[in-house]
Amino acid sequence: LDRVKQYLQEAGVAYCEMGGVQPNPIDGKVYEGIQLCRREQVDMMLPVGGGSVIDTAKAIAAGALYDGDFWDFFIGRAKVEKALKVAVVLTIPAAGSEGSGNTVITKTETLQKLGLCAPEHLRPVFSIMNPELTYTLPAYQTACGIADMMAHIMERYFTNTPDVEISDRLCEGTLTAIIKEAYRVKQQPDNYAA
């Protein structure tokens, strides 16, 4: 985070911060972020972190330019017609949200965990995915990322879709590479090639 702030300052880019996003992001942080964006006249979101941080930023991006309750988008009461631009600095492996127009948020009052798909407005305009930003992650988080990558690949692999031989071979090759590199990254977390 300090590195990103330094780059923004050097480039003369004004910014404001909001922290405290938790895994399985909740609506309270989205409401807080919407208020912050409106008060500070934010024109772009730059979440620095993993999937929960990115999902929260996407929900804020949609809600900041909407006159109603952002939750309207999640329950189908409204459609996202405009949103703040979202760019991403990914600091955890295998989030997935850095390349999609989807977001998942939990409403604490009802414990509803719902997704929103609005790729034309919420897909990040760019994502910085530098492996060096994962070097300081705890080994557990790296292992979770590896398991998550494998799970997503296996979702595609164990399908009943016919005639996907090439896709199956790509999945097998990718899984083989992930398994091989997982051992290296465990021993050398700062190995860029792993």
Regions found by a protein language model. Name each.
Residues L1-M44:
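ATP/NTP phosphate-donor binding region
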Residues V4, A57-I60, I178:
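Hydrophobic packing residues within well-ordered alpha-helices of enzyme cores
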Residues V21, L90, E132:
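Residues at the C-termini of beta-strands that transition into short coil/loop
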Residues P23-V30, D69-R77, T176-A194:
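A short, flexible low-complexity segment enriched in Lys/Arg and Gly/Pro that occurs
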Residues G28-M129:
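Glycine/threonine-rich beta-strand-loop-alpha-helix active-site module
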Residues N102-A194:
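Carboxylate- and glycine-rich phosphate/diphosphate-binding segment that chelates Mg2+/Mn2+
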